Amino acid sequence: MWDIHWKAMQRIIELGFAKEVYVRYNTNLSRTSLKGIKLFDLLPQFQDWQVCSSLDGTGEVGEYIRDGLDYEQWLENFKEGLAVAKTSREMRLDYTLTMPGLLELKNMFDLSQELNVELLTKVMFTFSPTEVLSPLALPHELLCTIIDEALEYMEPKATRKQQSLIDTLKNLKNRENLDDMFLGIDAVVGRKKGKERQQRIDKIRGQDITKILSRDKRVLEWWTSI
């Protein structure tokens, strides 16, 4: 967050307007303080507030998808917010489903239950056949199998706080994948270009997506076959 954010928040409080202001963040939650000013000391002074914290997977997978994420620091920051939250909608998880993130479905579900917070869920945009990190890049049968395995684990113990994840997964099974959206050679060539682009990005970042995908042999075999 920019310096001006912290100054503005303090100024609103100093002028006595905080009780008239609703504050909402969509944030990586990588920083919760600056120069002694703490976000979760400020927020309770406002009329209402909400933090939707972006997370695409736990641990190593989450750190791969969202470059720069320190998962353990993120978790510490999120729990700091939970300590001052008075309603269930003040601290929520915002999960964007990606292809590598499908390997984290059970872990994200468990995290939501362990923290007792709502897990808002959406799917990565897929505007081009090069979007190989989209779950819709996977063959439809494999995607549905992964989803069904996750639902079998989740549904018996899910609460309303995980319902967004379950609904999104069920909807995802009925969506067109890259082969349906971009017929024939376009889908094949697009995947190859997308894979090459991701490999270049990995090289720059010093990462390797195959290390992540090796968690599921089926997904790794698909990736290798592109």
Where are these regions (language model features)?
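Flexible glycine/acidic-rich beta-alpha junction loops that bind and position SAM and/or redox cofactors
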Residues: 99-102, 120-151, 158-172, 183, ...
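Radical SAM enzyme core and accessory elements
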Residues: 151-226
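Core AdoMet radical
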Residues: 1-4, 13-35, 43-76, 90-99, ...
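Betabetaalpha-Me/HNH-type nuclease active-site subdomain
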Residues: 85
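Class I S-adenosyl-L-methionine
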Residues: 79-82, 113
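Well-ordered, non-membrane alpha-helical segments in soluble/globular domains
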Residues: 5-10, 35-39, 71-80, 105-108, ...
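Catalytic cores of alpha/beta
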Residues: 99-115
